[in-house]
Amino acid sequence: MKLSNEDLCKLNKFWLYCEENQYFNVGYPESAAFDYSILEKFMKFSINNCGDWREESNYKLNSFEFEKEVMRFFSQLFKIPYNDSWGYISNGGTEGNMFSCYLAREIFPTAYIYYSEETHYSVDKIVRLLNIPARKIRSLPSGEIDYQNLVDQIQKDKQKNPIIFANIGTTMRGATDNIQRIQQDLASIGLERNDYYIHADAALSGMIMPFVEQPHPYSFEDGIDSISVSGHKMIGSPIPCGIVLAKRHMVDQISVEVDYISSRDQTISGSRNGHSALFMWTAIKSHSFVDWQGKVNQCLNMAEYTVQRFQEVGINAWRNKNSNTVVFPCPSEPVWRKHSLANSGSVAHIITMPHLDGPDKLDPLIEDVIYDLLPNYNILNVSGQN
């Protein structure tokens, strides 16, 4: 391939832009703490993981053997026997959520899906694409689902097989829906466990909960039927990707034979990026359980540092337990644009990812927010402090 000088100049400018902004994503959960340079040599190959990694595909240039090890790692992490599970490396959390909602719909074709108003916006798209009747449930000030409203709505709809879309770390407030309480509440209205489906959207916190001392319920042992995690968030990847995992006996119900590739396929996208499997494999092979614990503890410590800095001057900042998302009153537009802060309504947040590994990485932002809010901080409040 050969580019003109003008095109080369454009690429070089973009390179400089990326270099300048690599660590400037404090409002979004993207980790920049990764180095996959050892994998650069594989970029010359078109690696396509089309189909089921459990089977040999007629498309030889795949990374199934690496994907298989990645899925074994996550089956252990989320506490389900490897042979009882099936999942794959997706293009991101949204695809994982779609796969799980599709799976749930195939098991319960007449079910309604229930999710809180704090749920990621992708679910609104998914329910329209899959044509699943949906109910959006109120959220508590913390960002958790309103459990009573959930039960009331299910009873009002006379649903015998509801699909529950639970959050393990909401997008804006880092809140986790209590899976055990949901099951207890559903039992109280006469639903057996096999009568409904629980999906866990753990895009960010799926790589937090397994490594903290007192996790919220998050695993298959805790009662979930499927889970979706982003690979480019806590783990880190140059290409967005995700991991979705479900119970194998459920997935087998949607499996189809594809003669074109001489294999089965249960995935949403068909052709899948085989390089992502190499990224995820390299990440899990180069980190021990203790290493991941260290990364998570660092993130949570930096989140607590940020909360304390704000609270010391009277700004009502807070975070949920086991969350590296710090919520505070939204500063003025020049400040949130300068620091790429995500905001919703009257609040904004900072997400302390692994590359924000010390106070010096956060202090300039914290000071800008304090300077912006301090004249008004007595009348600005964030609802939902735990």
UniProtKB/Swiss-Prot annotation:
The keyword Lyase applies. Its cofactor is pyridoxal 5'-phosphate. Pfam families: Pyridoxal_deC. Substrate binds at H120. Its EC number is 4.1.1.22. One of its GO terms (biological process) is carboxylic acid metabolic process. Keywords: Decarboxylase, Lyase, Plasmid, Pyridoxal phosphate. The keyword Lyase applies. Pathway: Siderophore biosynthesis; anguibactin biosynthesis. The modification N6-(pyridoxal phosphate)lysine is found at K233. InterPro entries: Group_II_Decarboxylase, Hist_deCOase_bac, PyrdxlP-dep_de-COase, PyrdxlP-dep_Trfase, PyrdxlP-dep_Trfase_major, Pyridoxal-P_BS. PROSITE patterns: DDC_GAD_HDC_YDC. Gene3D superfamilies: Type I PLP-dependent aspartate aminotransferase-like (Major domain). GO terms for molecular function: histidine decarboxylase activity; pyridoxal phosphate binding. It catalyses: L-histidine + H(+) = histamine + CO2. It is an enzyme of class 4 (lyase). PANTHER family: PTHR46101, SERINE DECARBOXYLASE. Belongs to the group II decarboxylase family. Homotetramer. HAMAP family: Pyridoxal_decarbox. This is Histidine decarboxylase.
